[in-house]
């Protein structure tokens, strides 16, 4: 997490609206509770803190940090924060962040592709390297083990909150 603010600066060069204070994301002590609620991170606007669930699979923590830094820099919509997070990861020059951003992009684009064409999705998925496949499998297992009624309620409430925010 300590490298995240500096890594984020790679995206700022081309997009001055992303410029801002270099605040380090905070590892949450209550990460297991965040996992139970299906949260990988959240931005707390009253303190300006980007809070990260450090119990979530390691492969997505750098991209999650970039997502929350996007919120710190004024990007409110979740899909836009996701886009900026991937951009920042890919422009960071840091192999760990680049991998995390690419894997996150694959996850979201793969889900969209699967809805449009399961056959095309399977063709693309077959090209993944073993490490990426293992990380995605570990991510799926992690979240499946936390698929509870509390998680469903939390997700429903948060989704409702996001809709009220536009």
Regions found by a protein language model. Give the residues of each.
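Alpha-helical scaffolds flanking conserved acidic
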Residues: 59-63, 80, 97-104
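C-terminal amphipathic alpha-helical segment
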Residues: 111-127, 131-136
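Second-shell loop/turn segments in exported
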Residues: 51-55, 66-74, 95-96
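Short helix/loop segments within enzyme catalytic domains
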Residues: 86-118
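Active-site recognition of the HExxH zinc-binding catalytic motif
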Residues: 63-82, 86-87
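Pan-zinc metallopeptidase signature
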Residues: 128-166
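Auxiliary, metal-adjacent structural segments of Zn-dependent hydrolase domains
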Residues: 1-54, 58
């Amino acid at each position: 997490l300590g490298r995240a603010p500096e890594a984020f600066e790679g995206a700022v060069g081309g997009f001055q609206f992303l410029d801002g204070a270099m605040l380090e994301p905070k590892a949450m002590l209550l990460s297991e509770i965040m996992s139970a609620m299906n949260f990988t991170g959240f931005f707390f606007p009253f303190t300006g803190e980007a809070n990260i669930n450090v119990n979530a699979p390691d492969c997505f923590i750098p991209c999650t940090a970039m997502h929350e830094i996007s919120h710190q820099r004024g990007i409110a919509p979740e899909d836009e924060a996701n886009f900026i997070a991937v951009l920042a990861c890919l422009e960071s020059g840091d192999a760990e962040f680049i991998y995390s951003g690419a894997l996150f992009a694959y996850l979201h684009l793969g889900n969209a592709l699967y809805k449009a064409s399961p056959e095309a999705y399977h063709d693309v998925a077959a090209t993944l390297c073993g490490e990426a496949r293992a990380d995605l499998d570990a991510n799926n297992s992690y979240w499946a083990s936390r698929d509870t009624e509390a998680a469903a309620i939390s997700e429903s409430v948060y989704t409702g909150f996001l809709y009220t925010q536009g």
